[in-house]
């Protein structure tokens, strides 16, 4: 399966490395800046591509020969990037946590028979799965609090 990871920051880069460890995936990491891609040079099963992911047409071109798009761009770019992945006719998993309502893209995805999984990060994302599991196991959940820090600081 050909997977494009859109965004090579700390989270996107880590996801790309994890995916590249599985020989079932051919991973392409895409970012605007060579500096973001440089730490991923020479990783087996991983190719690098420079592209402006704020340009929806560029995203559609990137996705033309991919099977799955993984959105790992900053939140302010997330909605439009996800939209472009779907417009390219590809399913998507997104961790951007953008402010727009993802259900605005529901019709676009359904019209093409595509799946789009949004908010698939730590929180939201894993926290939602944990809460869902607790709901299954417990008779009643009255409160769930999840406290999550931001991205780690490189020192």
Which residue stretches match the model-derived regions?
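Rossmann-fold NAD(P)-binding glycine/threonine-rich loop
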Residues: 95-118
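Beta-loop-alpha module in the N-terminal Rossmann-like domain of NAD(P)-dependent dehydrogenases
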Residues: 68-84, 98-102
């Amino acid at each position: 399966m050909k997977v494009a990871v859109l965004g090579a920051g700390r989270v996107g880069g880590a996801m790309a490395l994890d995916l590249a460890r599985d020989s079932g995936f051919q991973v392409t990491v895409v970012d605007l800046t060579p500096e973001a891609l440089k730490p991923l040079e020479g990783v087996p099963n991983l190719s690098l591509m420079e592209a402006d992911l704020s340009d929806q047409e560029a995203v559609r071109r990137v996705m033309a020969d991919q099977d799955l798009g993984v959105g790992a761009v900053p939140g302010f770019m997330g909605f439009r990037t996800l939209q472009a992945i779907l417009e390219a006719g590809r399913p998507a998993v997104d961790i951007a946590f953008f402010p727009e309502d993802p259900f605005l893209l529901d019709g676009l995805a359904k019209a093409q028979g595509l799946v789009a999984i949004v908010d698939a990060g730590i929180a939201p994302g894993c926290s939602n799965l944990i809460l869902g599991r607790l709901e299954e196991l417990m008779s009643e959940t009255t409160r769930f609090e999840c406290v999550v820090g931001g991205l780690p600081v490189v020192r």
